[in-house]
Amino acid sequence: MSALLGILGVVLDARFGEPQGWHPLVAFGRLADRLERRFNRSRLAGEADPGVGWRSHGVTAWVLAVLPLTLLAWALAELPYLGWLVQALALYAALGLRSLGEHAEPVALALRAGDLDEARRRVGYLVSRDTRELDQAGVARAATESVLENGSDAVYAALFWFAVAGAPGVVLYRLSNTLDAMWGYRNARFERFGWAAAKIDDILNYLPARLVALTYALLGDTRQALRCWREQAPQWDSPNAGPVMAAGAGALGVFLGGAAIYHGELHQRPLLGSGPQPQGRDIYRALALVRQGVLLWLLVLAGLWAMGWLHA
């Protein structure tokens, strides 16, 4: 991995954001839909029966979706003269730091203006829960949770896998993460077919998530963040989101989690963090935490490069 190319990828994302009009992941999403229609038997059966929707079909679909593009990224990254450009563009396409701010900041602005309906509408672009009945604290909580968790998935984990394996690493991660978002549901349609996508995403996010939790702790209320991570994260249903959100909530000094409505059903989630309910300004604080953490990671990468541990 080139530390300088990693910095270049982050700069490109900060300057240009997501590609306008066309994004590689949009085309990949269409491919994933076609593969799911072809291989997911439980899509037709409408039930997670042992006789249909075998996990092996999900594994096959995952391999067909991810491995050819990962190998293509590896081959292109090895090209003389053009390989460096492929590396930087691969990271740029995988990052979502600027996009995260572009989606979260309007929520905070609407809350500041007292426009709760607009805040609910805006936060609906960030989260999958039902936002129609959220009060101001509920909107701020949903947005803050999304910033902390998506900061891990869409920013830090991409940087991690780019640091480990360059363009093929970040392509492998980003495509796997996208398939988890599309197939990783615990329902009749996807419970068997999406099992591989969900498990692979858990594996790929295991180390990055814990580095992110440590980053949040170092940049916020360290003692409280570490305590929340240790005591509260095991209660969360996701092995990777738990440490990230617990440490992030502790670092910010707010409460996250609690009751939320998903697809018409009330879910009682564990409470994370310590302190008051979040407000609109805490959305900005969460964004600042994510951005400061990215700068810290880039400084660490630059330091490793200066010591000769990473090539230029």
From Swiss-Prot:
The chain crosses the membrane at residues 59-79, 81-101, 153-173, 241-261, 292-312. The keyword Cell membrane applies. One of its GO terms (cellular component) is plasma membrane. Signal peptide: none annotated. Disulfide bonds: none annotated. Pathway: Cofactor biosynthesis; adenosylcobalamin biosynthesis. It comes from the Bacteria. One of its GO terms (biological process) is porphyrin-containing compound biosynthetic process. It is found in: Cell membrane. InterPro entries: Cobalamin_biosynth_CobD/CbiB. Keywords: Cell membrane, Cobalamin biosynthesis, Membrane, Porphyrin biosynthesis, Transmembrane, Transmembrane helix. Its main location: membrane. PANTHER family: COBALAMIN BIOSYNTHESIS PROTEIN CBIB. Belongs to the CobD/CbiB family. HAMAP family: CobD_CbiB. This is Cobalamin biosynthesis protein CobD. It comes from Pseudomonas aeruginosa (strain ATCC 15692 / DSM 22644 / CIP 104116 / JCM 14847 / LMG 12228 / 1C / PRS 101 / PAO1).
